[in-house]
Amino acid sequence: IFGGSLGAKKINEAVFKSIDKLKDFNIIHIVGKNNSKSIEKPNYFQIEFAKNIWDYFNLADLVVSRAGANSIFEIQALKKPMLLIPLGKTQSRGDQIENAEAFKRYGFASVLYEEELTPVTLFKSITNLNKNKERYIKRMEEVSSVPSNKLVLQKILDLSK
């Protein structure tokens, strides 16, 4: 679970409050600099920053992330089912919402909008993603790099308008 290089307060708080419910998952939580909280659970590992995020992505069965283009394409390349929590329009240009919705349309990810993020919705979303992870993996395996390139090209064209 990570909210970008600086972390994400709302994601972190939802994770902290849902740790007990997420007991069936082993969680690596990248909280961002100065966002650590003392939580001692056998299934929970917390770090402030990951120098090589790919190592953590490779370890993961599922990824919970913001919806920045670089990150989600890296996660897709590794064929990891993902729950995307895009920055809202009040915090960004809205590009993360567009990215998340495109990945949802293509069957690569599920989406939980930040405005709907609570410990309960986070738990339900992670549980549903886990139940359906094979479907997401299969969909990512079906898609060659050509459609991914088309997604990137379409994004560039959309941004240039």
Question: Model-derived features: where do they sit?
Answer:
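A donor-sugar binding/catalytic signature common to diverse glycosyltransferases
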Residues: I53-R93
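C-terminal alpha-helical cap of glycosyltransferases
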Residues: N128, S145-K161
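C-terminal "capping" alpha-helix adjacent to the active site of nucleotide-linked donor transferases
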Residues: F108-K133
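A short, well-ordered alpha-helix in the C-terminal region of glycosyltransferases
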Residues: E134-V146
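Short histidine/acidic/glycine/proline-rich micro-motifs that form metal-
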Residues: S5-G7, L87-Q91, E142
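Short beta-strands and strand-loop turn motifs
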Residues: I1-F2, P81-P86, S110
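Donor-nucleotide binding loops and adjacent catalytic segments primarily
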Residues: I1-S65, I97-E101, L112-V120
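Glycine-rich phosphate/nucleotide-binding loop
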Residues: E74, P86-Y113
